Amino acid sequence: MDEEIAALVVDNGSGMCKAGFAGDDAPRAVFPSIVGRPRHQGVMVGMGQKDSYVGDEAQSKRGILTLKYPIEHGIVTNWDDMEKIWHHTFYNELRVAPEEHPVLLTEAPLNPKANREKMTQIMFETFNTPAMYVAIQAVLSLYASGRTTGIVMDSGDGVTHTVPIYEGYALPHAILRLDLAGRDLTDYLMKILTERGYSFTTTAEREIVRDIKEKLCYVALDFEQEMGTAASSSSLEKSYELPDGQVITIGNERFRCPEALFQPSFLGMESCGIHETTFNSIMKCDVDIRKDLYANTVLSGGTTMYPGIADRMQKEITSLAPSTMKIKIIAPPERKYSVWIGGSILASLSTFQQMWISKQEYDESGPSIVHRKCF
Protein backbone atom coordinates (compact mmCIF):
# COMPACT_ATOMS: atom_id res chain seq x y z
CA MET A 1 0.00 0.00 0.00
CA ASP A 2 1.18 3.53 -0.70
CA GLU A 3 2.02 5.44 2.42
CA GLU A 4 -0.09 8.23 0.92
CA ILE A 5 -3.27 6.25 1.56
CA ALA A 6 -1.97 3.59 3.92
CA ALA A 7 -4.28 2.78 6.80
CA LEU A 8 -3.13 3.78 10.26
CA VAL A 9 -3.03 1.06 12.89
CA VAL A 10 -3.30 2.23 16.50
CA ASP A 11 -3.15 -0.27 19.34
CA ASN A 12 -4.09 1.61 22.50
CA GLY A 13 -2.88 -0.42 25.42
CA SER A 14 -3.30 0.44 29.10
CA GLY A 15 0.45 0.97 29.36
CA MET A 16 1.83 1.68 25.91
CA CYS A 17 0.33 3.02 22.71
CA LYS A 18 1.63 1.35 19.54
CA ALA A 19 0.99 3.13 16.25
CA GLY A 20 2.10 2.95 12.65
CA PHE A 21 1.15 2.20 9.05
CA ALA A 22 -0.61 -0.91 7.77
CA GLY A 23 1.79 -3.12 5.86
CA ASP A 24 4.78 -2.25 8.05
CA ASP A 25 6.25 -5.07 10.10
CA ALA A 26 6.59 -3.05 13.30
CA PRO A 27 4.94 0.02 14.82
CA ARG A 28 6.75 3.32 14.10
CA ALA A 29 5.69 4.91 17.36
CA VAL A 30 5.62 3.23 20.75
CA PHE A 31 5.07 5.53 23.70
CA PRO A 32 3.56 5.36 27.18
CA SER A 33 -0.23 5.90 27.34
CA ILE A 34 0.14 8.67 29.88
CA VAL A 35 -1.00 12.24 30.20
CA GLY A 36 0.88 14.36 32.73
CA ARG A 37 -0.19 17.62 34.32
CA PRO A 38 2.10 19.93 36.31
CA ARG A 39 2.02 19.36 40.06
CA HIS A 40 3.17 22.89 40.83
CA GLN A 41 2.44 26.37 39.55
CA GLY A 42 5.11 27.54 37.10
CA VAL A 43 7.37 30.28 38.48
CA MET A 44 9.42 30.99 35.36
CA VAL A 45 7.53 33.43 33.20
CA GLY A 46 7.79 32.80 29.48
CA MET A 47 8.96 29.21 29.85
CA GLY A 48 6.09 28.19 27.61
CA GLN A 49 4.80 25.60 30.06
CA LYS A 50 1.98 23.47 28.71
CA ASP A 51 -1.04 22.47 30.72
CA SER A 52 -0.51 18.83 29.75
CA TYR A 53 2.15 16.52 28.35
CA VAL A 54 1.67 13.19 26.56
CA GLY A 55 3.77 10.04 26.26
CA ASP A 56 7.56 10.25 26.36
CA GLU A 57 7.54 13.96 27.12
CA ALA A 58 5.34 13.32 30.16
CA GLN A 59 7.70 10.49 31.09
CA SER A 60 10.82 12.68 30.89
CA LYS A 61 9.24 15.49 32.95
CA ARG A 62 7.65 13.03 35.39
CA GLY A 63 9.41 14.60 38.38
CA ILE A 64 7.20 17.70 38.18
CA LEU A 65 4.03 16.08 36.84
CA THR A 66 1.16 13.98 38.09
CA LEU A 67 0.86 11.09 35.65
CA LYS A 68 -2.50 9.61 34.72
CA TYR A 69 -3.29 6.62 32.53
CA PRO A 70 -6.57 7.19 30.61
CA ILE A 71 -6.88 3.46 29.90
CA GLU A 72 -7.41 1.27 32.93
CA HIS A 73 -7.75 -2.49 32.71
CA GLY A 74 -7.88 -2.19 28.93
CA ILE A 75 -10.89 0.11 28.95
CA VAL A 76 -10.87 3.85 28.33
CA THR A 77 -11.95 5.68 31.48
CA ASN A 78 -11.01 9.24 30.59
CA TRP A 79 -12.07 10.33 27.11
CA ASP A 80 -10.59 13.84 27.23
CA ASP A 81 -7.16 12.43 27.95
CA MET A 82 -7.69 9.66 25.40
CA GLU A 83 -8.38 12.29 22.77
CA LYS A 84 -5.08 13.95 23.71
CA ILE A 85 -3.27 10.65 23.21
CA TRP A 86 -4.85 10.13 19.77
CA HIS A 87 -4.08 13.71 18.80
CA HIS A 88 -0.47 13.20 19.86
CA THR A 89 -0.34 9.90 17.92
CA PHE A 90 -1.52 11.38 14.64
CA TYR A 91 0.07 14.81 14.67
CA ASN A 92 3.30 14.41 16.69
CA GLU A 93 4.29 10.76 16.37
CA LEU A 94 3.10 9.67 12.91
CA ARG A 95 2.82 13.22 11.53
CA VAL A 96 -0.21 12.44 9.40
CA ALA A 97 -3.57 14.07 8.87
CA PRO A 98 -6.15 11.58 10.21
CA GLU A 99 -8.76 12.89 7.77
CA GLU A 100 -6.69 11.35 4.95
CA HIS A 101 -6.27 7.80 6.27
CA PRO A 102 -8.53 4.94 7.36
CA VAL A 103 -7.81 4.11 11.03
CA LEU A 104 -7.82 0.64 12.59
CA LEU A 105 -8.20 0.77 16.38
CA THR A 106 -7.99 -2.12 18.82
CA GLU A 107 -10.06 -2.89 21.89
CA ALA A 108 -10.08 -5.31 24.79
CA PRO A 109 -12.31 -8.38 24.50
CA LEU A 110 -15.63 -7.97 26.34
CA ASN A 111 -15.30 -4.20 26.04
CA PRO A 112 -18.52 -2.38 27.01
CA LYS A 113 -20.55 -1.47 23.92
CA ALA A 114 -20.66 2.21 24.81
CA ASN A 115 -16.87 2.22 24.77
CA ARG A 116 -16.49 1.24 21.12
CA GLU A 117 -19.32 3.61 20.13
CA LYS A 118 -17.48 6.48 21.76
CA MET A 119 -14.25 5.51 19.96
CA THR A 120 -16.13 5.49 16.68
CA GLN A 121 -17.72 8.85 17.38
CA ILE A 122 -14.41 10.53 18.25
CA MET A 123 -12.69 9.18 15.15
CA PHE A 124 -15.39 10.44 12.80
CA GLU A 125 -16.42 13.65 14.56
CA THR A 126 -13.21 14.92 16.15
CA PHE A 127 -10.60 13.58 13.73
CA ASN A 128 -12.80 13.33 10.60
CA THR A 129 -11.31 10.02 9.50
CA PRO A 130 -12.62 8.75 6.12
CA ALA A 131 -13.06 5.21 7.51
CA MET A 132 -12.35 3.22 10.66
CA TYR A 133 -12.61 -0.22 12.22
CA VAL A 134 -12.34 -1.63 15.74
CA ALA A 135 -10.67 -5.04 16.10
CA ILE A 136 -10.31 -7.27 19.17
CA GLN A 137 -6.73 -7.34 20.41
CA ALA A 138 -6.37 -11.07 21.02
CA VAL A 139 -7.71 -11.96 17.56
CA LEU A 140 -5.04 -9.73 16.00
CA SER A 141 -2.32 -11.49 18.03
CA LEU A 142 -3.47 -14.81 16.66
CA TYR A 143 -3.37 -13.48 13.06
CA ALA A 144 0.16 -12.26 13.72
CA SER A 145 1.20 -15.79 14.67
CA GLY A 146 -0.15 -17.04 11.34
CA ARG A 147 -3.08 -18.95 12.82
CA THR A 148 -6.86 -18.67 12.70
CA THR A 149 -7.54 -21.19 15.47
CA GLY A 150 -5.99 -21.17 18.93
CA ILE A 151 -6.31 -19.70 22.38
CA VAL A 152 -4.56 -16.41 23.09
CA MET A 153 -3.40 -15.54 26.58
CA ASP A 154 -2.98 -11.80 26.18
CA SER A 155 -1.50 -10.00 29.15
CA GLY A 156 -0.58 -6.36 28.98
CA ASP A 157 -0.22 -3.61 31.54
CA GLY A 158 -3.85 -3.33 32.57
CA VAL A 159 -5.66 -6.57 31.92
CA THR A 160 -5.18 -10.24 31.04
CA HIS A 161 -7.57 -12.17 28.81
CA THR A 162 -7.77 -15.72 27.61
CA VAL A 163 -9.55 -15.75 24.26
CA PRO A 164 -10.34 -18.98 22.39
CA ILE A 165 -10.62 -18.37 18.65
CA TYR A 166 -11.93 -20.83 16.10
CA GLU A 167 -11.51 -20.20 12.36
CA GLY A 168 -11.00 -16.49 13.01
CA TYR A 169 -13.96 -15.95 15.32
CA ALA A 170 -13.53 -15.27 19.03
CA LEU A 171 -15.85 -17.44 21.15
CA PRO A 172 -17.33 -14.85 23.54
CA HIS A 173 -18.89 -17.33 25.98
CA ALA A 174 -15.45 -18.79 26.70
CA ILE A 175 -13.44 -15.57 27.02
CA LEU A 176 -12.17 -15.05 30.54
CA ARG A 177 -10.80 -11.85 31.94
CA LEU A 178 -8.38 -11.40 34.79
CA ASP A 179 -7.80 -7.93 36.20
CA LEU A 180 -4.22 -8.76 37.02
CA ALA A 181 -1.48 -7.59 34.71
CA GLY A 182 1.73 -5.61 34.40
CA ARG A 183 0.66 -2.60 36.44
CA ASP A 184 -0.37 -4.79 39.37
CA LEU A 185 2.98 -6.57 39.21
CA THR A 186 4.77 -3.21 39.24
CA ASP A 187 2.75 -2.19 42.31
CA TYR A 188 3.52 -5.53 43.94
CA LEU A 189 7.24 -5.10 43.25
CA MET A 190 7.02 -1.62 44.82
CA LYS A 191 5.50 -3.25 47.88
CA ILE A 192 8.06 -6.04 48.25
CA LEU A 193 10.95 -3.63 47.65
CA THR A 194 9.56 -1.49 50.47
CA GLU A 195 9.89 -4.56 52.70
CA ARG A 196 13.58 -4.56 51.80
CA GLY A 197 13.77 -0.97 53.00
CA TYR A 198 13.71 0.81 49.64
CA SER A 199 10.94 3.35 49.34
CA PHE A 200 9.12 4.01 46.05
CA THR A 201 5.86 5.92 46.37
CA THR A 202 5.17 8.57 43.72
CA THR A 203 3.80 7.98 40.22
CA ALA A 204 7.27 8.90 38.91
CA GLU A 205 9.03 6.36 41.12
CA ARG A 206 6.60 3.70 39.99
CA GLU A 207 8.13 4.08 36.51
CA ILE A 208 11.57 3.28 37.95
CA VAL A 209 10.17 0.11 39.53
CA ARG A 210 8.57 -0.81 36.20
CA ASP A 211 12.02 -0.62 34.63
CA ILE A 212 13.51 -2.85 37.37
CA LYS A 213 10.69 -5.33 36.74
CA GLU A 214 11.26 -5.39 32.98
CA LYS A 215 15.02 -5.78 33.27
CA LEU A 216 15.43 -8.20 36.19
CA CYS A 217 12.29 -10.26 36.83
CA TYR A 218 11.73 -13.80 35.61
CA VAL A 219 9.31 -16.69 36.18
CA ALA A 220 10.56 -19.65 38.22
CA LEU A 221 9.77 -23.14 36.92
CA ASP A 222 9.38 -24.36 40.49
CA PHE A 223 8.65 -21.53 42.92
CA GLU A 224 9.38 -23.34 46.20
CA GLN A 225 12.66 -24.72 44.90
CA GLU A 226 13.70 -21.27 43.64
CA MET A 227 12.87 -19.73 47.04
CA GLY A 228 15.17 -22.32 48.60
CA THR A 229 17.99 -21.47 46.19
CA ALA A 230 17.55 -17.75 46.87
CA ALA A 231 17.69 -18.31 50.63
CA SER A 232 20.82 -20.47 50.57
CA SER A 233 22.98 -18.60 48.05
CA SER A 234 23.41 -15.19 46.50
CA SER A 235 23.58 -16.58 42.96
CA LEU A 236 20.20 -15.07 42.05
CA GLU A 237 20.99 -11.56 43.29
CA LYS A 238 21.27 -8.72 40.80
CA SER A 239 21.99 -5.06 41.31
CA TYR A 240 20.24 -2.07 39.74
CA GLU A 241 21.43 1.52 39.61
CA LEU A 242 18.79 4.13 40.40
CA PRO A 243 18.75 7.48 38.52
CA ASP A 244 20.54 9.15 41.46
CA GLY A 245 23.43 6.69 41.39
CA GLN A 246 22.30 4.64 44.39
CA VAL A 247 22.61 0.90 43.77
CA ILE A 248 19.99 -1.51 45.06
CA THR A 249 20.21 -5.30 45.19
CA ILE A 250 17.29 -7.61 44.55
CA GLY A 251 17.14 -11.37 45.06
CA ASN A 252 14.00 -13.47 45.41
CA GLU A 253 11.91 -10.40 44.44
CA ARG A 254 13.02 -11.15 40.88
CA PHE A 255 10.73 -14.18 40.64
CA ARG A 256 8.35 -13.44 43.54
CA CYS A 257 6.92 -10.54 41.55
CA PRO A 258 5.74 -12.40 38.39
CA GLU A 259 4.81 -15.46 40.49
CA ALA A 260 1.65 -13.48 41.28
CA LEU A 261 0.48 -14.28 37.73
CA PHE A 262 0.27 -17.92 38.79
CA GLN A 263 -0.70 -17.23 42.40
CA PRO A 264 -2.90 -14.11 42.55
CA SER A 265 -3.28 -14.71 46.30
CA PHE A 266 0.10 -12.94 46.57
CA LEU A 267 -1.78 -9.76 45.68
CA GLY A 268 -4.68 -10.58 47.97
CA MET A 269 -6.81 -11.59 44.96
CA GLU A 270 -9.06 -14.62 45.00
CA SER A 271 -8.92 -15.30 41.27
CA CYS A 272 -7.26 -18.20 39.43
CA GLY A 273 -3.77 -17.81 38.01
CA ILE A 274 -3.11 -17.36 34.28
CA HIS A 275 -2.53 -21.10 33.78
CA GLU A 276 -5.85 -22.05 35.37
CA THR A 277 -7.70 -19.24 33.58
CA THR A 278 -6.35 -20.53 30.25
CA PHE A 279 -7.45 -24.06 31.15
CA ASN A 280 -10.91 -22.87 32.26
CA SER A 281 -11.33 -20.96 28.99
CA ILE A 282 -10.54 -24.10 27.00
CA MET A 283 -12.99 -26.12 29.10
CA LYS A 284 -15.79 -23.67 28.27
CA CYS A 285 -15.36 -24.52 24.58
CA ASP A 286 -16.93 -27.33 22.61
CA VAL A 287 -15.23 -30.63 23.36
CA ASP A 288 -14.33 -31.12 19.67
CA ILE A 289 -12.13 -28.04 19.41
CA ARG A 290 -10.24 -28.31 22.70
CA LYS A 291 -7.45 -30.35 21.15
CA ASP A 292 -6.75 -27.54 18.66
CA LEU A 293 -6.70 -24.98 21.45
CA TYR A 294 -4.29 -26.95 23.65
CA ALA A 295 -1.94 -27.35 20.69
CA ASN A 296 -2.13 -23.64 19.79
CA THR A 297 -1.80 -21.68 23.01
CA VAL A 298 -0.36 -18.32 21.99
CA LEU A 299 1.17 -15.85 24.45
CA SER A 300 0.79 -12.18 23.66
CA GLY A 301 1.44 -8.82 25.33
CA GLY A 302 4.26 -7.27 27.35
CA THR A 303 3.49 -9.16 30.56
CA THR A 304 4.28 -12.45 28.79
CA MET A 305 7.86 -11.27 28.15
CA TYR A 306 9.31 -12.69 31.39
CA PRO A 307 12.00 -15.30 30.79
CA GLY A 308 10.69 -18.71 31.85
CA ILE A 309 6.99 -17.95 31.42
CA ALA A 310 6.39 -20.33 28.48
CA ASP A 311 8.04 -23.31 30.20
CA ARG A 312 6.06 -22.66 33.36
CA MET A 313 2.77 -22.40 31.39
CA GLN A 314 3.62 -25.67 29.63
CA LYS A 315 4.25 -27.37 32.98
CA GLU A 316 1.11 -26.00 34.67
CA ILE A 317 -1.31 -26.65 31.80
CA THR A 318 0.11 -30.14 31.27
CA SER A 319 -0.73 -30.97 34.88
CA LEU A 320 -4.30 -29.67 34.47
CA ALA A 321 -5.09 -31.20 31.05
CA PRO A 322 -5.84 -34.85 30.21
CA SER A 323 -2.57 -36.81 30.34
CA THR A 324 -2.54 -37.79 26.65
CA MET A 325 -3.16 -34.26 25.39
CA LYS A 326 -0.49 -32.60 23.25
CA ILE A 327 0.13 -29.12 24.63
CA LYS A 328 2.06 -26.45 22.81
CA ILE A 329 2.76 -22.98 24.13
CA ILE A 330 3.71 -20.53 21.40
CA ALA A 331 5.68 -17.50 22.55
CA PRO A 332 6.61 -15.44 19.46
CA PRO A 333 9.66 -13.21 20.08
CA GLU A 334 7.77 -10.13 18.89
CA ARG A 335 4.77 -10.81 21.15
CA LYS A 336 5.09 -7.44 22.83
CA TYR A 337 3.78 -5.96 19.56
CA SER A 338 1.83 -8.88 18.14
CA VAL A 339 -1.53 -7.10 18.48
CA TRP A 340 -0.19 -4.22 16.39
CA ILE A 341 1.43 -6.57 13.86
CA GLY A 342 -1.86 -8.45 13.47
CA GLY A 343 -3.62 -5.14 12.87
CA SER A 344 -1.06 -4.23 10.25
CA ILE A 345 -1.65 -7.56 8.49
CA LEU A 346 -5.45 -7.28 8.68
CA ALA A 347 -5.67 -3.68 7.45
CA SER A 348 -3.51 -4.42 4.41
CA LEU A 349 -5.50 -7.47 3.22
CA SER A 350 -7.43 -6.81 0.01
CA THR A 351 -10.36 -8.82 1.38
CA PHE A 352 -10.55 -6.51 4.40
CA GLN A 353 -11.13 -3.35 2.40
CA GLN A 354 -14.91 -3.81 2.29
CA MET A 355 -14.98 -4.19 6.09
CA TRP A 356 -14.12 -0.57 6.92
CA ILE A 357 -16.88 1.61 8.36
CA SER A 358 -16.99 4.61 6.03
CA LYS A 359 -17.79 8.18 7.03
CA GLN A 360 -20.92 7.90 4.88
CA GLU A 361 -22.16 4.80 6.73
CA TYR A 362 -21.47 6.54 10.02
CA ASP A 363 -23.42 9.63 8.97
CA GLU A 364 -26.37 7.44 7.98
CA SER A 365 -26.43 5.13 11.01
CA GLY A 366 -24.59 6.82 13.88
CA PRO A 367 -22.12 5.22 16.32
CA SER A 368 -24.10 1.98 16.68
CA ILE A 369 -22.90 0.95 13.18
CA VAL A 370 -19.75 -0.32 14.92
CA HIS A 371 -21.61 -3.30 16.41
CA ARG A 372 -22.88 -4.38 13.02
CA LYS A 373 -19.60 -4.06 11.15
CA CYS A 374 -16.99 -5.00 13.75
CA PHE A 375 -17.24 -8.31 15.52
From Swiss-Prot:
SUPFAM superfamilies: Actin-like ATPase domain. Transmembrane segments: none annotated. One of its GO terms (molecular function) is ATP binding. Its EC number is 3.6.4.-. In vertebrates 3 main groups of actin isoforms, alpha, beta and gamma have been identified. The alpha actins are found in muscle tissues and are a major constituent of the contractile apparatus. The beta and gamma actins coexist in most cell types as components of the cytoskeleton and as mediators of internal cell motility. The modification Methionine (R)-sulfoxide is found at residues 44, 47. The modification Tele-methylhistidine is found at residue 73. The lineage of its organism: Eukaryota, Metazoa, Chordata, Craniata, Vertebrata. The modification N-acetylmethionine is found at residue 1. It comes from Danio rerio (Zebrafish). Polymerization of globular actin (G-actin) leads to a structural filament (F-actin) in the form of a two-stranded helix. Each actin can bind to 4 others. It is an enzyme of class 3 (hydrolase). It catalyses: ATP + H2O = ADP + phosphate + H(+). Oxidation of Met-44 and Met-47 by MICALs (mical1, mical2 or mical3) to form methionine sulfoxide promotes actin filament depolymerization. Mical1 and mical2 produce the (R)-S-oxide form. The (R)-S-oxide form is reverted by msrb1 and msrb2, which promote actin repolymerization. PANTHER family: ACTIN (PTHR11937). This is Actin, cytoplasmic 1. Skeletal muscle, heart, gill, digestive tissue and brain. Widespread expression throughout the brain, with highest levels in regions where neuronal proliferation is greatest. Pfam families: Actin (PF00022). Actin is a highly conserved protein that polymerizes to produce filaments that form cross-linked networks in the cytoplasm of cells. Actin exists in both monomeric (G-actin) and polymeric (F-actin) forms, both forms playing key functions, such as cell motility and contraction. In addition to their role in the cytoplasmic cytoskeleton, G- and F-actin also localize in the nucleus, and regulate gene transcription and motility and repair of damaged DNA.
